[in-house]
Curated annotation (Swiss-Prot):
Keywords: Chloroplast, Plastid, Ribonucleoprotein, Ribosomal protein. Belongs to the bacterial ribosomal protein bL36 family. InterPro entries: Ribosomal_bL36, Ribosomal_bL36_sp. This is Large ribosomal subunit protein bL36c.
Length: 37
């Protein structure tokens, strides 16, 4: 899980979702997981 100021999709399978007021990226590739800090 990378914590970044700006999150973006890295590949086609990345999905931007909002959980509890945070923006997350979930993907089939675990390296692409991100959270906005």
């Amino acid at each position: 899980m990378k914590i970044r100021a700006s999150v973006r999709k890295i590949c086609e399978k990345c999905q931007l979702i909002r959980r509890r007021g945070r923006i997350l990226v979930i993907c089939s590739n675990p390296r692409h997981k991100q959270r906005q800090g």
